[in-house]
Each structure stands twice: as C-alpha cells, then as structure tokens.
UniProtKB/Swiss-Prot annotation:
InterPro entries the record matches: ClpP, ClpP/crotonase-like_dom_sf, ClpP/TepA, ClpP_His_AS, ClpP_Ser_AS
Similarity field: Belongs to the peptidase S14 family.
Record's keyword annotation contains Cytoplasm: yes
Naturally occurring in which organism (per UniProt): Sodalis glossinidius (strain morsitans)
Role, per record: Cleaves peptides in various proteins in a process that requires ATP hydrolysis. Has a chymotrypsin-like activity. Plays a major role in the degradation of misfolded proteins.
PANTHER family the UniProt entry points to: ATP-DEPENDENT CLP PROTEASE PROTEOLYTIC SUBUNIT
E.C. designation(s): 3.4.21.92
Record's protein name: ATP-dependent Clp protease proteolytic subunit
Subcellular location: Cytoplasm
Gene3D superfamilies the record matches: 2-enoyl-CoA Hydratase, Chain A, domain 1
An example molecular function term from Gene Ontology annotations: ATPase binding
UniProt keywords, alphabetically: Cytoplasm, Hydrolase, Protease, Serine protease
Superkingdom, natural source: Bacteria
Amino acid sequence: MALVPMVVEQTSRGERSYDIFSRLLKERIIFMTGQVEDHMANLIVAQMMFLEAENPEKDIYLYINSPGGVITAGMSIYDTMQFIKPDVSTFCMGQAASMGAFLLAAGAKGKRFCLPNSRVMIHQPLGGFQGQATDIEIHAREILKVKARMNELMAKHTGQPLEVIERDTERDRFLSAPEAVDYGLVDSVLSQRT
C-alpha cells in the first residue's frame, strides 16, 4: 500500500487532517498518474463531476504523469472533459504517453501546459486479441475505427492536418516539452508558477 501524506489544517473548531490529494481537490487539482484504467478513470470522472457541481465557472486542473492505458477508460475521461462546463487545464509532469498524451491535448485551448523536462509520446492504439478468425477480424475492424476516430480528435485538438497525425502516430513519436508546443499538443512550457 502506498504512503499518502496527510495535511493538518487549523480551523476555528480545531484541527482537521486530509490526505494530500483530498486537500488538493479542494483547490480543484486532480492527479492522473500511472496506467489509465477503469478504476482510475471512474475516480477522475467523479472528481470532475463533483467539481463542476461545486462551481461550474471555475477551471479544473488535471496534472498528468501517465504511460497511457486502456482506450475506453481514457475516452470516458476525455468525454467528461468535453462535456462538463468548467474548462479543464492540463499539465504534463514527467510524461504523457499514448492515452496520457491524448488527454493532455484535450485540455482547454490556451490552458494546456508541459513542465520543462516532461516528455510526450503519441502513437496509434495498441490492441491484441485471440480467438476464432472471424472474431479476430471483428476486433481488427473495431481497432481501426478507434484509430481513425482518435486521429480525427488529435487533429482537432492540435491543429495538425489529419494526414500528419496519421503519419506521426504510425510509430512511437517522442516529443520534448518545446516540441509538444510546436506540435500543438500543449500551449506552452511552464518553468515556474507565476
């Protein structure tokens, strides 16, 4: 079990302790770290929905350090980001790869950032299936549809032509923070909080 630091606050009614992530959630900060999978996605979606209900006018800040993960889990986060009223500002710290990069680019325009030593990696969806030939064919068609849809959305969020996205995601493509800005995945590199 991972150790989660506690924060103790003094109030007029005494002391109150929070785990660090709950305290940061009060500041509208959500962390997306590790593999994108269903449990993580459900927690992130729930936090976004809670913050929207609490104040639909204030931005939400999503900090990403992820190697990517399950497409359907990531798409639930993506759809929620697009659906809710508050802007979701995205920050890459460490790495945003695969679905992590996709969600980084999906932040509100002008509010997508990388820290200076972050790296971003884009590529096509990964998948594997075994079974009868007909079932393999069905799954192959489905992953090609998912690939086409993700490329369309990546083109929309980066401003890159679809053909460029299709070419660049054919294999793993790594970008430094400044390269991610040039590509349109993020809007700027932040070296210090202002």
